[in-house]
Amino acid sequence: MTNDSLPQLKNSLEEQGVRYCLPSYVDIHGVSKSKFVPISHFDRMMAGSELCTGAALDGVPQDVSDEEVSSHPDPESVIILPWKKDVAWFASDLWCEGKPFEPCSRNIFKAILA
C-alpha cells in the first residue's frame, strides 16, 4: 500500500464506523502494547506520531535520556476488531531517530526473512 492510498483507507474505515485506531507492537516478552488514537489523527498516526519512551519498555536497551521510539503502523495489517467494530487494529514497526528500531520484534523478523 502506498502513501497515496492512505486517504482511501481512512475513508473506508470511517465508512465502516471506525472511530479509533490501535497501533500495536509486541514487546520482548510477547506482550502486545498499543495506544488508542482517534480516527481524526489517522494521518499523523500513520506518519509515526505515536511515541513511547524506550527506557520504560521492559527489555529495551535504552536510557531515560535516549530519543523516544515512534510507532509506524503497517496499513496492510489493518483489521477491524470483531468484538469492537469502532476500533481498527494495526501491527506497527518501531522507529528511533528516523530508522527502524533494532529491538522491535517486527524489525527482527524482517531481518531474519531478508
Where are the predicted features?
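ATP/Mg2+-dependent ligation/transfer catalytic cores
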Residues: 1-114
